[in-house]
Amino acid sequence: MSEIFDVNAAIYPFPARPVPLDTNEKAFYREKIKTLLKQRDAVLVAHYYTDPEIQALAEETGGCVADSLEMARFGNNHPASTLLVAGVRFMGETAKILNPEKKVLMPTLNAECSLDLGCPVDEFTAFCDSHPDRTVVVYANTSAAVKAKADWVVTSSIAVELIEHLDSLGEKIIWAPDRHLGSYVQKKSGADVLCWQGACIVHDEFKTQALARMKALYPDAAVLVHPESPQAVVDMADAVGSTSQLIQAAKTLPQKTLIVATDRGIFYKMQQACPDKELFEAPTAGEGATCRSCAHCPWMAMNGLRAIAEGLEQGGGMHEIHVDEELRQQALIPLNRMLDFANQLKLQVKGNA
């Protein structure tokens, strides 16, 4: 696999951690959110990586907890006129692309994603223009503007199948933005993949030596790894997959102890799926290294109860997602192409992001 344009050196400033709420404040905001959801004809859709109390509230109020694409599709099928998306900004954009007639609000428009930040549209356009013979495949974790430049949008659970399909047609691929997922897909498919060099700041921190030491402490444990992790970590896995695939693996694997290499937000739904199993976070530091994310996306952490209440209450420019209509139409083409491909394969598209 060819690899150029290394953006790995970028250090993204993390947002300030939300001020913790006490028990009374949490109860106050939960009730306020429930009231505002009814008043605004809104539904709360939360990503697997948000904090457990947010996921619980989404389920309690008739919303959903899912990956970014399923969040958008749930919103499309739900009768509510407003979607409150608890996640990061590209997830709100995806919801708006697929639901243009609905108002899409977010707790904050400043919730970024290192994969999105690491693939700016102008640089990516120039990169694609310099390789006009290649089919452009971008991960769901990208801006609407980058999606609009792509031939295909893809989620992690369908990535290998799609690249195998394109390879069978003799097509050469540009893959963006995650280099680890790109490497994984190339290794599984054998396709000619030219990979953009972005990375998820959470998954990029998982360490092989520290994981090996943890595995030695729990020799009977199964290791579950998201493919946005480094290849050496993926090679240690008993199961590799997207968020929904890892939850399914946790249910079906015979081991009662699981070491999980993805954002710890997934533990809420994973523990629901297998309450009899013991879950451990895979280590993100060791051998003299320190972690920055420490297995939890700092931008996902911005989706607190107070911020959700403010998003519903204030709406407007500080919270509403807007996507230019021409751009939306362009981004919708590769998204629909992926959905059609998945339906043909009779796959349920459940990605990460």
UniProtKB/Swiss-Prot annotation:
So what does this thing catalyse? iminosuccinate + dihydroxyacetone phosphate = quinolinate + phosphate + 2 H2O + H(+)
Record localization: Cytoplasm
Q: Name one GO biological process term.
A: 'de novo' NAD biosynthetic process from L-aspartate
Q: Which GO terms describe its cellular component?
A: cytosol
List its EC numbers. Answer: 2.5.1.72
The note on cofactor binding and number reads: Binds 1 [4Fe-4S] cluster per subunit.
Superkingdom of the source?
Answer: Bacteria
Residues recorded as binding iminosuccinate, renumbered to this chain, are 47, 68, 139-141, 156, 226-228, 243
GO function term, MF aspect, one: 4 iron, 4 sulfur cluster binding
* Stretches that traverse the bilayer: none
Gene3D superfamilies the UniProt entry points to: NadA-like
State a single Pfam family of this protein: NadA
Q: Which residues bind [4Fe-4S] cluster?
A: 113, 200, 297
Main location per the UniProt record:
cytoplasm
Q: Which UniProt keywords apply?
A: 4Fe-4S, Cytoplasm, Iron, Iron-sulfur, Metal-binding, Pyridine nucleotide biosynthesis, Transferase
| The protein's annotated pathway | Cofactor biosynthesis; NAD(+) biosynthesis; quinolinate from iminoaspartate: step 1/1
* Cofactor(s) it depends on: [4Fe-4S] cluster
HAMAP family tied to this protein: NadA_type1
Q: What does this protein do?
A: Catalyzes the condensation of iminoaspartate with dihydroxyacetone phosphate to form quinolinate.
- Recorded family membership: Belongs to the quinolinate synthase family. Type 1 subfamily.
Know the name of this protein? Quinolinate synthase
> Native species of this protein?
Yersinia pestis bv. Antiqua (strain Nepal516)
Whichever gene encodes this chain, its name is nadA
